[in-house]
C-alpha cells in the first residue's frame, strides 16, 4: 500500500512568514516534474504488471492519485522519498472516490488506460485549480473517434469499447490532457492512430518515452503530429521522470527578483528556453555549464517586456504569475496576455496589495514597474499564484505573510527547505496544533 506521509499543516490560517530583502546563493536541486509524474502514474495502468517510477516528488496531488489508483485495485507503494512502485495487475472498474477525484484534475487521465485495457471506464468529472473551464470535450471526442461509446451522466463520464480502433484525430486545440489521454488509449488500440494538432509539451514527450519503455510504438512525440501503432499488451518498466521545468522557472524568478546568483540542477535546457529567453531580454545572464545545470546571474536593473502565454514551445501559462512578479519591479511598462486559461489573474490584486501597479482588462494585464514591493498579508488563489506571492515576498521590503498553502503543497516539494538552503528567511507558521487530515 502507498505509505502516506502526513503533509505539512495547511489550515486556512496556516501561512508562510517571509522576511524579504535577503540575497540567495548556492545550488538548488530540482525535483521530478509533478505534471509528468501524475500522467505516468495513470499510464502505469496500461500494463498488468509492476512499474517503478523514479524522481516522483512526495506531493499532495501524488498522494491523492495514489489513493484513487488503490480504489481501482492497484497496489501503490512508496519506495523512499522519490520513487513509487505501481502494480496494476488487479486493475478493476470500481468508481474512484469522488471526494478525491473532485480535488484532482489529473484523475481523469485514468479514463484512457481503463477503457483501453478493460473495455470500460467510469470516471467522475475532475477538479483541481480553479483557473478556467479546462473542459474534457476533446478527450471525449477523441475516444468516440476510436470507437468508444461515451456518456456523461450525473457528473460521471462512462466510456465503453470492446476494442478501441485506430483512427485519425484532429484536436481543435493542442490540449496537453487530451493528447496524453488519447495517446495512452491508442497504445492498446487495434491499428494505427494519428493525433493531429497534438500538444508538444515536454511532459507529452516524457509520457511517450515511458510508454515506449513499456513496449508501445509511438512516433512523433514533441511535434504536432503523433502516430501510435497499437500493440496487444504492454509490460512494466522502471523509468525516471524528467526534471520539473516549472519548479526550475520558479527558482530562476526567485533569484531574479532578489538579484541573486544561483545554480539549478538537474534541468533540461531546452525545456527552459521560453523563460530563459525572456529573462535574458530583461537583462539577466543565464548560462548552461553542462547539459543538466543552469547558472543564473541577475541584472542590476530589469527592463520591461511583454509576455504572451502560449502552448509549448511558447511561454508557459504556469510561469505567467511568477514572471509578473518580476515585471512589477522592472523599469518601464509591460503587457501580459493570458491566452491559455481564463481566470488566471487571481494574483494581481494581491501583488497590488504589496505595492505593484497592475491593471487587468479581459485577458490582458498592464504593468507599470515600481521601485520595490512592500510586505503584506496576501492569499494565493491557485498553485502558481501562491508560488508567485512567495517569490514576491522574498523581494519585498519587510514581512510578508502568504496564505493559501494548500495550493502550494499541491505542486512544490520541500520549497521552504530549498529556499532556506539558498539563504531565504521564511518559515511556515501554524497557529493551531491540530493537524490537517492525512491525504
Curated annotation (Swiss-Prot):
Which biological pathway? Cell wall biogenesis; peptidoglycan biosynthesis
Q: Name one Pfam family in it.
A: EPSP_synthase
Query: Which reaction(s) does its UniProt entry say it catalyses?
Result: phosphoenolpyruvate + UDP-N-acetyl-alpha-D-glucosamine = UDP-N-acetyl-3-O-(1-carboxyvinyl)-alpha-D-glucosamine + phosphate
According to its UniProt record, the EC number is 2.5.1.7
Localization recorded for this chain is: Cytoplasm
UniProt keywords (A-Z) are:
Cell cycle, Cell division, Cell shape, Cell wall biogenesis/degradation, Cytoplasm, Peptidoglycan synthesis, Pyruvate, Transferase
Residues that the record marks as modified (2-(S-cysteinyl)pyruvic acid O-phosphothioketal) are 129
Principal subcellular localization: cytoplasm
Q: What class of enzyme is it?
A: transferase
What is the disulfide pattern of this chain?
A: none
This protein's record includes keyword Cell wall biogenesis/degradation: yes
Recorded GO CC terms: cytoplasm
Q: Where does phosphoenolpyruvate bind?
A: 34-35
| GO MF annotation, one | UDP-N-acetylglucosamine 1-carboxyvinyltransferase activity
Active-site feature positions: 129
User: Which residues are recorded as binding UDP-N-acetyl-alpha-D-glucosamine?
Assistant: 105, 134-138, 318, 340
Q: Give the Gene3D superfamilies listed for this entry.
A: Enolpyruvate transferase domain
InterPro entries to which the protein is assigned, alphabetical: Enolpyruvate_Tfrase_dom, Enolpyruvate_Tfrase_sf, MurA_subfamily, RNA3'P_cycl/enolpyr_Trfase_a/b, UDP_GlcNAc_COvinyl_MurA
Q: Which family does it belong to?
A: Belongs to the EPSP synthase family. MurA subfamily.
Which named protein is this? UDP-N-acetylglucosamine 1-carboxyvinyltransferase
Organism encoding this protein? Thermosynechococcus vestitus (strain NIES-2133 / IAM M-273 / BP-1)
| Source lineage | Bacteria, Bacillati, Cyanobacteriota, Cyanophyceae, Acaryochloridales
